[in-house]
């Protein structure tokens, strides 16, 4: 099917078959709402279902049906304000013909209930049909493997289980008036759905993290990446220790730098910001940043920012000037208390909204302009975290003042609470004895730097201290990576299993506590203990921690393991035969990959 964007006009049918080719169920009139490179997503309401027996009925509540392309499952999501209900079918990859999605149902299913209970169902039917339909070993193996993958998605809350995946679709349905129903049972559906969502978010004991994000006008360098890699480690550590987390990382997609770039290049602000936002997402993928839950953009939230500034105005914190509106810092008790003497000299009211004649403009009470930088972040925190205090607010150390001080002032003004329990001001990355900066021209682009080397450098540094990038530092990181590779390959070679005992949890807790020094000390103790004793339990602890750190080399080692295991066994075989010449040939292959 031709790729299209959200809210397509056509309706299609769906047919489910048994393995012997019998059609046993059909859905008529499912609306395509999304068709991209990954999924076809259908919206079902009043669709007609027909059974092989002749029985038929109409869908009476809204649901989504997700068909991942080239996967062995599809997902039916019943949308309910009290919580969504997932029904996952294990199937063949679907085909599309005659305006119909067609697939073979392998009977075994997974249910996920609104309170997050998960259940594998119809196992007996699957086992019966192995005999009745003669499922070959390849089908049985595929089904069991897919069940494990889906359970992993659920455990990590990734893919369609991610908190934003369904809610973003529901939000688009609501905006397009597709969740307005005549039925009394479904009255005010979208309002109830999102009220319940906000209530659940507020009531849950969630570890709440916000990290100031980039202005997307150029490619990011490794200095920009330090904060996000550090915070990703901390958030994943909290997840590992059993905490639910909400990690928000904003995107500034309109500001003076973007407008200047637009004027210089004669390309619209939107095209520039979209281009570099795409580039940033590629870099996040390269650096294996997967813990971010929301990435709100300024241009998508102008109306909310306007309402936020109005709320401050009603409380008497806004002063109107000829060129915009400023926040009255004199009304905030202890404003600037944490500042240095030099910073205190620079304390002044700051713009919430500033008039401008250059670039894209928005309207605030008759003033054409743009929101202030400090208001954007404060609004996102207030809106997404339901006016609660964060557990960690992170950013570069250069944002301490005025940005973070001004965010906190606005939050106190609106909500009478501090914006965060803990500030995390990550140290700068220095190159050629200066702060890495585009204006100085001393940058190393993140896309050009090895992500594993960078992570090693960060883990072996204090979170708040500056890092000086040198050839010696990079070479030292390579030595550590090679050591980790050899240990991890040995772990796989011995067919050991990951360990989640107190020793591993202790080290992960040190990452969660931002105590990277103690983490390294303990990890190196276990590496030394293994090298001395060669005890499998020590290697298991070390490898479990290395796996937690989520290096790129892990994926490559696991991908090539079967091939390299054969090479390893051949090498060992020649050693036993004392055929050292041939043994050295195979040993060299493993050495070249850094595996032994």
From Swiss-Prot:
Q: Which gene encodes it?
A: cysS
Residues of the region (Unknown) are 1-199
Record-given protein name: Cysteine--tRNA ligase
Organism per entry: Mycoplasmopsis pulmonis (strain UAB CTIP)
Keyword Cell inner membrane: yes or no?
no
The record's subunit annotation is: Monomer.
Q: Where is this motif: 'KMSKS' region?
A: 435-439
Supply the EC number(s): 6.1.1.16
Q: Name one GO cellular component term.
A: cytosol
- Name the residues that bind Zn(2+): 212, 377, 403, 407
Which InterPro entries does the annotation name? Cys-tRNA/MSH_ligase, DUF402, FomD-like_sf, Rossmann-like_a/b/a_fold, tRNA-synt_1_cat_dom
Chain positions recorded as ATP binding sites: 438
């Amino acid at each position: 099917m031709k790729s299209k964007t959200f809210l397509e006009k056509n309706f299609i049918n769906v047919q489910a078959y048994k393995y012997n080719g019998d059609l046993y169920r059909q859905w008529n009139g499912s609306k395509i709402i999304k068709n991209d490179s990954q999924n076809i997503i259908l919206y079902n309401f009043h669709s007609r279902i027909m059974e092989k027996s002749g029985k038929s009925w109409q869908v009476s509540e809204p649901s989504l049906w997700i068909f991942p392309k080239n996967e062995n499952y599809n997902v039916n999501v019943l949308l309910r304000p009290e919580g969504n209900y997932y029904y996952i079918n294990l199937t063949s990859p679907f085909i599309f013909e005659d305006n119909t999605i067609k697939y073979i149902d392998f009977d075994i299913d997974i249910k996920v209930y609104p309170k997050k209970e998960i259940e594998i169902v119809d196992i007996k039917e699957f086992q019966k049909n192995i005999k009745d339909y003669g499922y070959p070993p390849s089908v049985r193996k595929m089904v069991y493997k897919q069940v494990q993958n889906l359970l992993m998605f659920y455990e990590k809350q990734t893919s369609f289980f991610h908190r934003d995946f369904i809610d973003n679709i529901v939000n688009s349905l609501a905006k397009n008036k597709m969740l307005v129903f005549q039925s009394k049972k479904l009255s005010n559906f979208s309002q109830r759905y999102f009220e319940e969502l906000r209530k659940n978010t507020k009531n849950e004991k969630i570890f709440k993290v916000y990290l100031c994000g980039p202005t997307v006008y150029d490619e990011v360098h490794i200095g920009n990446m330090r904060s996000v890699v550090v915070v990703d480690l901390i958030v994943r550590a909290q997840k590992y220790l059993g905490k639910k987390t909400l990690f928000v990382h904003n995107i500034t997609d309109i500001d003076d730098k973007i407008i200047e770039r637009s004027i210089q290049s004669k390309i619209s602000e939107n095209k520039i910001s979209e281009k570099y936002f795409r580039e940033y997402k590629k870099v996040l993928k390269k650096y294996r940043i997967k813990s971010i839950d929301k990435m709100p953009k300024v241009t998508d939230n102008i109306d909310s920012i306007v309402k936020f500034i109005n709320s401050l105005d009603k409380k008497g914190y806004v002063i109107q000037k000829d060129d915009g509106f400023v926040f009255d810092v004199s009304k905030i008790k202890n404003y600037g208390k944490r500042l240095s003497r030099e910073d205190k000299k620079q304390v002044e009211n700051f713009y919430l909204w500033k008039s401008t004649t250059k670039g894209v403009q928005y309207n605030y009470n008759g003033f054409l302009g743009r929101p202030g930088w400090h208001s954007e972040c404060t609004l996102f925190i207030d809106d997404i975290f339901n006016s609660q205090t964060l557990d960690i607010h992170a950013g570069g150390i250069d944002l301490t003042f005025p940005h973070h001080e001004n965010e906190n002032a606005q939050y106190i003004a609106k909500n009478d609470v501090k914006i965060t329990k803990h500030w995390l001001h990550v140290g700068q990355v220095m190159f050629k004895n200066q702060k890495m900066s585009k204006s100085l021209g001393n940058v190393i682009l993140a896309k050009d730097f090895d992500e594993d080397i960078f992570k090693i450098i960060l883990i072996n540094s204090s979170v708040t201290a500056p890092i000086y990038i040198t050839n010696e530092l990079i070479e030292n990181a390579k030595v550590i990576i090679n050591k980790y590779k050899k240990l991890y390959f040995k772990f796989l070679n011995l067919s050991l299993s990951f360990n989640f005992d107190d020793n591993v949890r202790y080290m992960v807790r040190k990452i969660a506590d931002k105590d990277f020094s103690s983490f390294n000390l303990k990890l190196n103790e276990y590496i030394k203990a293994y090298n001395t004793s060669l005890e499998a339990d020590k290697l298991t602890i070390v490898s479990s921690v290395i796996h937690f750190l989520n290096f790129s080399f892990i994926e490559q080692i696991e991908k090539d393991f079967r091939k390299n295991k054969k090479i390893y066994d051949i090498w060992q075989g020649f050693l036993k035969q004392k055929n050292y010449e041939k043994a050295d040939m195979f040993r060299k292959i493993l050495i070249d990959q850094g595996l032994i």
